[in-house]
């Protein structure tokens, strides 16, 4: 089995469990169905906005837009600190304030419907090009939930003795340095050679 075959097998399995497969070049800014403004953008803004609007109908539009801004611009230079801050927003909701009946009210905008998984949008995207500060990289598969890149999978050729899962681990470590923005939103990292697999976090 080649690395490409392993990637296709993985995508087939992901579709079997409910993910929608999208091909990275198709949803690029210059693709047939663009979902991002450029290769630097790691969140899919249209998907995120649609999900926030769908899951939070009782919160005013301006507050929902504020939540989107908070999520897409975490404003924290440290990767680990940004990742922790996003995790808090993902689990507990994004804090917002708005005026109602002459009073300032506080609420939380949900990014995911934890109680009803079927109400979320699950995408598995392969060959998703990301432009970092100095390098451009393309991880094998990224899993998006409501437009958020929560899981990154790096695969290696099971037939190549020199390309085991630890090579995939080294690749992810390189990605952290070269395309750090996508890791701000990461919840799970997966490495596999088709026989062995490991998962973890930052």
Enumerate the language-model features and the residues they cover:
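An alpha-helical interface "stripe"
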Residues: 1-202
């Amino acid at each position: 089995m080649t690395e490409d075959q392993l990637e296709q097998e993985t995508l087939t399995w992901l579709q079997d469990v409910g993910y929608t497969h999208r091909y990275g070049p198709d949803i690029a800014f210059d693709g047939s169905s663009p979902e991002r403004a450029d290769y630097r953008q790691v969140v899919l803004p249209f998907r995120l906005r649609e999900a926030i609007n769908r899951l939070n109908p009782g919160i005013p539009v301006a507050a929902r837009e504020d939540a989107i801004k908070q999520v897409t611009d975490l404003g924290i230079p440290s990767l680990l600190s940004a990742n922790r801050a996003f995790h808090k927003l993902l689990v507990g909701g994004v804090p917002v304030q708005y005026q109602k009946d002459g009073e300032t009210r506080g609420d939380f905008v949900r990014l995911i419907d934890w109680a009803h998984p079927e109400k979320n949008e699950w995408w598995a995207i392969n060959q998703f090009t990301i432009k970092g500060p100095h390098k451009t990289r393309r991880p094998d598969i990224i899993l998006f939930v409501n437009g958020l890149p929560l899981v990154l999978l790096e695969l290696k050729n099971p037939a190549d003795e020199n390309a085991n899962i630890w090579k995939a681990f080294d690749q992810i470590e390189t990605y952290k340095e070269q395309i750090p923005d996508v890791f701000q939103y990461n919840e799970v990292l997966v490495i596999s050679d088709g026989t062995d697999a490991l998962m973890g976090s930052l």
